């Protein structure tokens, strides 16, 4: 399988039993590709028209999303917005978290703003995909800008006892961390990846180090052992060589 990213599709020509896609690569090269199936994703937009935003002086961006601050309040005092109406990840759990921040604010509390760079993402395909925090490329860029080093470890499910039992050994976990510092990102492809991300999300948000994670016991046989083994390997003492 080949995945092409950061390309710009210029045209799609229907040839009956196949289609021709003309696209431009990031380096400017124009390419023609024959394909059997074309799936087009147009993204999402908010339904913010005709709900009284302009009449109440509420600011929106060029795409129609409502502008809010860290407490989810708009530019108009007393009016808040959360979920798919604001320019944040369009995920149900993110909208829920935003509502919690808003409610705590209304109750007079001082909740921490959501760090959108670390929210958990899940893709319910097969095998499942999940991730939170930085990608490897983003971490490398961050390290270069801040004079830091990063370490990356990919641990497969192929030797995991639970994965073998359920017959789902394809996939891996990838941990990205600052050298001698906190975990920066967790990426999982494999069985129950969306369920396994919870531990990674906590570790990334609590800025746990790989040394912290490596000392924790993961029950056997479970898929979560792969997370622990990846952390142990990052300390320089890999279990499987």
Predicted regions and their residues:
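FAD-site-proximal beta/loop scaffold in flavoenzymes
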Residues: 32-108
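Glycine-centered tight beta-turn/hairpin loop motif at sheet-sheet or coil-to-beta transitions
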Residues: 26-30
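A conserved short coil-to-beta-strand element within the FAD-binding core of flavoproteins
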Residues: 5-18
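Flexible, glycine-rich terminal cap/loop adjacent to redox cofactors
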Residues: 107-108, 124-135, 140-241
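N-terminal periplasmic "start-of-domain" segments of outer-membrane beta-barrel proteins
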Residues: 114-124
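Short beta-strand segments that buttress and anchor functional surface loops
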Residues: 21-24, 163-164
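Conserved beta-strand segments of alpha/beta enzyme cores
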Residues: 2, 59, 148-151
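Internal hydrophobic alpha-helix adjacent to the cofactor/substrate pocket in enzyme cavities
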Residues: 82, 93-116, 144-149, 205-208
